[in-house]
From Swiss-Prot:
Note: Reaction proceeds via a cis-phosphoenolate intermediate.
Organism, as annotated: Haloterrigena turkmenica (strain ATCC 51198 / DSM 5511 / JCM 9101 / NCIMB 13204 / VKM B-1734 / 4k) (Halococcus turkmenicus)
Isomerase recorded as keyword: yes
NCBIfam families, sorted: eIF-2B_rel, ribulose_e2b2
Catalysed reactions, semicolon-separated: alpha-D-ribose 1,5-bisphosphate = D-ribulose 1,5-bisphosphate
GO terms assigned for molecular function: ribose 1,5-bisphosphate isomerase activity; S-methyl-5-thioribose-1-phosphate isomerase activity
Protein name, UniProt field: Ribose 1,5-bisphosphate isomerase
Length: 327
């Protein structure tokens, strides 16, 4: 089946591979796919004993968890579904797991809609919003504003190296929002035309720091210098509860070929195979924006100053968080 475990369903492995390859992207989309994968694992499990069923579900969760270390929505989704796995028989465990996954997916869909309504309240007719990368939560705010009849425009950073800004631009044009696409290095120049910076988050730490696509921190610093408010749109599944107990957030490093493919590298170094060519390529996927550069974090529970999100974390997750896939 796969070297990640004989008990893991092929469909789960496929989902894990798609998350790792960023074919499934966006924190909410990743969380939804993870919940769906656990439901599929539960449905297709051939376990005959309850302990074997639980072992298979945890193995599936671990396979999914190991794909994206920074996207905290993934472990939060896995924790939620596994916490609802309950019963004394395989049939009961199967039914409870599937029901829990479906509940999570319903709540997830409603959360984004609620978040969008909160974020839309920050926008006024004629506002110009600068975006970075592609965030379904940030887009939910803009969509809600458009549906409310608010006339807005967008300045969209292309977001190298994977050009996720193109996805954002495409969606905004489908809503008839006027869009200006800019290269990343032009943000400082075009901030003079912006009323807001609106970004998403892959995760948010207990101190209010925002972990998001590389380039977010630099944009936030420049925006503060120019007096442009920075809003982070993030569902509470992106809060990182482990940071309450001193854990740090791992910054994912992606393949250097996203920046330079083999032919481009050879052209720079004038070597055929790139071995010992003296060229190093760094490709961190995310950076950390300190809370002092963020004006507000918008969630489905309302709008919060970044320094207060730890209170929300404690309400939602308690003081400690288990990793059930390790049990």
């Amino acid at each position: 089946m796969d070297d990640r475990g004989p008990d893991v369903a092929p469909a789960v492995v496929t989902t894990a591979d798609e998350i790792a390859a960023m074919e499934i992207r966006g924190a909410a989309t990743i969380a939804d796919a993870a919940a769906e994968a656990l439901a599929i694992q539960a449905e297709r499990s051939d376990a005959e004993r309850p302990d074997a069923f639980e072992r298979q579900l945890r193995a599936a969760a671990k396979t999914l968890y190991e794909t994206r270390p920074t996207a905290v929505s993934l472990p939060n989704a896995l924790r939620y579904v596994l916490a609802g796995m309950d019963g004394e028989t395989v049939a009961e465990l199967r039914a409870s797991t599937i029901a829990r996954a479906e509940e999570f997916q319903r709540d997830l869909a409603q959360a984004q809609s609620k978040l969008g309504s909160v974020g839309a309240n920050r926008l006024r007719d004629g506002d110009v919003v600068m975006t970075h990368c592609h965030s379904t939560d940030a887009l939910a705010c803009l969509e809600a504003a458009v549906e409310d009849g608010t006339e807005i425009e967008a300045i969209v950073k292309e977001t190298r190296p994977r050009l996720q800004g193109h996805i954002t631009a495409r969606q905004l044009r489908e809503w008839d929002v006027p869009v200006t696409v800019i290269v990343d290095g032009a943000a400082r120049r075009y901030l003079d035309q912006a009323d807001h910076v609106l970004v998403g988050a892959d995760s948010i730490a207990a101190d209010g720091s925002v972990i998001n696509k590389i380039g977010t921190s630099g944009l936030a610093v420049i925006a503060r210098e120019r007096g442009v408010p920075v809003t982070v749109a993030a569902q509470t599944i992106k809060l990182h509860p482990d940071t309450m107990t001193g854990h740090t957030v791992e910054i994912e490093r992606r393949d250097e070929r996203e920046v330079l493919d083999d032919d481009e590298r050879a052209a720079i170094t004038d070597t055929a195979d790139g071995a010992d060519d003296g060229l190093t390529v760094e490709n961190p996927a995310f950076d950390v924006t300190p809370p002092r550069y963020v004006d507000a974090i918008v969630t489905e529970h309302g709008q919060f100053p970044p320094e207060t999100v730890v209170t929300l974390m404690r309400e939602l997750f308690g003081e400690t968080v288990d990793e059930p896939w390790e049990l």
